[in-house]
Amino acid sequence: MATKKKVLLKVIILGDSGVGKTSLMNQYVNKKFSNQYKATIGADFLTKELMVDDRVVTMQIWDTAGQERFQSLGVAFYRGADCCVLCYDVNVAKTFENLDSWRDEFLIQAGPRDPDNFPFVVLGNKIDLENQRVVSQKRAASWCQSKGNIPYFETSAKEAINVEQAFQTIARNAIKLEDGLVFPIPTNIQVIPEPQPAKSGCC
């Protein structure tokens, strides 16, 4: 069986500053977590190679700054994305309420070909602080359903809960978009010869 070509996927993680975007990315790629918070300046990315079904996938994960003053950087980073991850902190209501504006911002800046079917994944992070939770799982799931059944995971970058599973889903959804943009070459092409001019001859 012929090996399928390698796939490069661009994934953008969006959300308010402090929700754990960098920590989720580091936990998934490097299996590391740091309690020291350092705000991302502009944008940064890590890559990870993984197998999805029978193909090798290289995922380029972009972690963008949550501060408003960096949102003007959006167009350059959002364009060409194959999946957008919307991240919030289950213990801070405002970070969940801002998901709408992050989603809208992405669709405006990235300008995907088919915005209604563009793959998003929502991550409710910091579930290790369960006693501080203010956004219920039901409320988040309801929001995701209202936006076209966006896949939803509750995660903990600190405890590595659901991080691997979430990024597997992110990769699968991104591949679906990539596959949809590949236009198959029809096999039933007919070549019609050009008509030859009639030869003049003696009667």
Swiss-Prot record:
SUPFAM superfamilies: P-loop containing nucleoside triphosphate hydrolases
Catalytic activity entry: GTP + H2O = GDP + phosphate + H(+)
Lipidation (S-geranylgeranyl cysteine): 202-203
Keyword Transcription regulation among UniProt keywords: no
Enzyme Commission code(s) on record: 3.6.5.2
GO molecular-function terms, A-Z: G protein activity; GTP binding
Coiled coil region boundaries: none
Annotated keywords: Autophagy, Cytoplasmic vesicle, Endosome, GTP-binding, Hydrolase, Lipid degradation, Lipid droplet, Lipid metabolism, Lipoprotein, Lysosome, Membrane, Nucleotide-binding, Prenylation
Catalytic class of the enzyme: hydrolase
One example of a Gene Ontology biological process annotation: lipid catabolic process
Bilayer topology term: Peripheral membrane protein
Principal localisation: membrane
Residues binding GTP: 15-22, 34-40, 63-67, 125-128, 157-158
SMART domains with a match to the protein in the record: RAB, RAN, RAS, RHO
GO cellular component: autophagosome membrane; cytosol; early phagosome; early phagosome membrane; endocytic vesicle; late endosome; late endosome membrane; lipid droplet
Record PANTHER family: RAB FAMILY, RAS-RELATED PROTEIN RAB-7A
Name under which the protein is recorded: Ras-related protein Rab-7a
Source organism per UniProt: Dictyostelium discoideum (Social amoeba)
Organism phylogeny: Eukaryota, Amoebozoa, Evosea, Eumycetozoa, Dictyostelia
